Structures are given as structure tokens and as C-alpha cells.
């Protein structure tokens, strides 16, 4: 899980979603997991 100021899709399978006011990226590739913070 990477914590970043700006979350971006890193590949085609990445999805940007918002959970409880936190912007997250979920992906099949574990290295692409991110959240904003």
C-alpha cells in the first residue's frame, strides 16, 4: 500500500474508488495499491 498525495491509475486494471472519504486505487497487481493521505 502506497500513501500518496495524488493517486493515479498505474495500469488498465487499476480502479480508483472512494471508501469512507478516502480515495483508493485497487488492482490485481498488489504493487499498484494506493491510498490518498
Swiss-Prot record:
NCBIfam families associated with the record: rpmJ_bact (TIGR01022)
InterPro entries linked: Ribosomal_bL36, Ribosomal_bL36_sp
UniProt GO cellular component terms: cytoplasm; ribonucleoprotein complex; ribosome
Family: Belongs to the bacterial ribosomal protein bL36 family.
Record key words, sorted: Ribonucleoprotein, Ribosomal protein
Designated name of the protein: Large ribosomal subunit protein bL36
A GO MF term: structural constituent of ribosome
Family annotation (PROSITE patterns): RIBOSOMAL_L36 (PS00828)
Single GO biological process annotation from the record: translation
Organism: Aliarcobacter butzleri (strain RM4018) (Arcobacter butzleri)
Recorded superkingdom: Bacteria
Amino acid at each position: 500500500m502506497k500513501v500518496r498525495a495524488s493517486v493515479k491509475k498505474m495500469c488498465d486494471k487499476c480502479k480508483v474508488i472512494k471508501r469512507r472519504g478516502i480515495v483508493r486505487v485497487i488492482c490485481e497487481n498488489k504493487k499498484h495499491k494506493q491510498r490518498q493521505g
